[in-house]
């Protein structure tokens, strides 16, 4: 991918001639507080640095097209980062509806108390925007959009960008509509998984929020995520525990351990 190297930004090690991937950390790679142009933007960018969100660009290197995943706080900066790397953003996907993954109008219940740019930016660009069907209505309200401006996703659905497919795995627990995305190239190879707030290295997303479910998370982790290939790279929604892991590593020492029973899981989460 010489066109990526020509930008002065090194491509991610998982990139090759056909597969494009880039990880962005909020407050460091985008939404950088020192780059804020207004006091309100500085507040947003300071929150971004505090929350340590990972955002992702995934797509087809040959077509030079990618999907933005969980692009919030500075969606224009995410689009600019993709363009700097030689790719055009053609769609956006959210792994779940929480404000730090889709943005917020600053008024709806459960927000940060200020407007946050996010999915609405991609709607205004005329791009398709995807979220799990169970969270579509509340997400639309949260970002002051019409429901028909969002596209629903369900378990097993795929979003294509060039020859790359992002397959949806519904993983309720952190939220009712949380999803994991598996990137698959046209040779059928599963290249990586984006786990949102379902799996972090050594842990999982919070289960004390409205709509969270301890039992649903256990089922998602032990029956869906743990069933994936041990070698599959895993990239989380926040820098809580590190930038990446693998399914096998989480089965050995994380919350995918097969020794965790439902009873022991409930006790762990009740602490």
Regions found by a protein language model. Give the residues of each.
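Generic structural signal for helix capping and beta-alpha/helix-loop junctions
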Residues: 31, 99, 138-139, 242-244
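Zn-dependent metallo-beta-lactamase
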Residues: 1-66, 71-85, 123, 271
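Metallo-beta-lactamase
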Residues: 64, 158, 165, 170, ...
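Binuclear metal-dependent hydrolase catalytic cores
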Residues: 2-19, 23, 105-111, 126-127, ...
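Conserved S/T- and glycine-rich ATP-binding loop of Class I adenylate-forming
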Residues: 58, 95, 171
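Short Gly/Pro-enriched turn/cap motifs at secondary-structure boundaries
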Residues: 46-48, 150, 170-172
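Structural detector of well-ordered beta-strand residues that form the stable sheet scaffold
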Residues: 21, 68, 90, 130, ...
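Active-site HxH/HxHxD metal-binding segment of metal-dependent hydrolases
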Residues: 51-52, 66, 73-165, 184
